[in-house]
C-alpha cells in the first residue's frame, strides 16, 4: 500500500478548520500534532492547510467555511462550533462529496466520516462524580456556563453539562443545581476587564 501511494502522482489537499488560539492553549497541541503528521507523511503527496475561525464569533466560522468550500479540498478536518453553524458547512461538504472528520467535539446529528476526541457526555458525568467526592453533603452547587450570542458556548460544553446533570440526578437528586451564565468575551478582553 505504501509503495502504491508513493507511485501515485495524485496530490491531495486537506484543510483543517480550528479555532484561533493563543500559544500554550489546548489547540496549540492539536496544531503541533497536525504539523508532525504532515512531516511524517510528506511522502504521500499531501498538503495540509490550517484555517482558523474566531471562537467568539459564529460568523467567523461561516466565513472560514465558505473560504474552504471555494478551494474544494480532498478532505476537511473541522473542530465544530455550535451545531446549527456546523451543519450548514457539513451539508455543503456532503453536497460536494468532500469527506470530513471532526476533532474534539462530535455532533451526532451531523455524522462525519470519523471523530477524534473524547465522549463529552461521559466527561461531564465523570466530572460530577469527582466533584461530589469532595462536595458529598452539599445541598447546592453551581454550574458556570459560557454563553455566546445566546447559545451555550459549544456542542461539547452542552454535552458535558448533560452528562453532569445525569450523574447528579442519578446519585444526588436532592442537590440543587444553580446556573451562572458567563457571557463569553475573548481572553484578552477578559484580562482587560479584570484589571
Region roles according to the model:
Residues 2-31, 113-114, 140-152:
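Short beta-strand segments enriched in small/hydrophobic residues
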Residues 47-72, 177-195:
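Structural motif
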Residues 84-122, 146:
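Flexible loop/hinge segments that line or gate small-molecule binding clefts
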Amino acid at each position: 500500500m505504501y509503495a502504491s501511494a508513493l507511485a501515485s502522482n495524485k496530490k491531495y489537499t486537506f484543510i483543517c478548520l480550528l479555532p484561533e488560539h493563543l500559544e500554550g492553549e489546548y489547540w496549540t497541541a492539536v496544531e503541533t500534532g497536525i504539523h508532525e503528521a504532515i512531516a511524517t507523511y510528506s511522502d504521500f503527496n499531501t498538503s495540509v492547510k490550517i484555517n482558523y475561525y474566531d471562537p467568539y464569533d459564529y460568523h467567523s466560522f461561516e466565513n472560514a467555511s465558505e473560504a474552504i468550500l471555494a478551494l474544494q479540498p480532498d478532505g476537511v478536518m473541522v473542530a465544530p462550533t455550535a451545531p446549527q453553524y456546523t451543519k450548514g458547512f457539513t451539508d455543503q461538504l456532503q453536497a460536494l462529496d468532500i469527506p470530513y472528520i471532526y476533532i474534539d467535539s462530535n455532533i451526532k446529528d451531523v455524522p462525519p466520516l470519523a471523530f477524534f476526541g473524547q465522549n463529552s457526555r461521559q466527561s461531564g458525568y465523570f466530572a460530577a462524580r469527582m466533584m461530589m467526592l469532595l462536595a458529598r453533603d452539599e445541598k447546592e452547587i453551581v454550574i458556570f456556563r459560557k454563553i455566546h450570542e445566546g447559545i451555550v458556548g459549544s456542542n461539547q460544553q452542552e454535552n458535558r453539562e448533560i452528562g453532569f446533570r445525569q450523574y447528579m440526578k442519578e446519585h444526588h437528586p436532592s442537590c440543587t443545581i444553580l446556573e451562572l451564565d458567563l457571557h463569553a468575551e475573548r481572553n484578552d478582553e477578559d484580562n482587560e476587564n479584570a484589571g
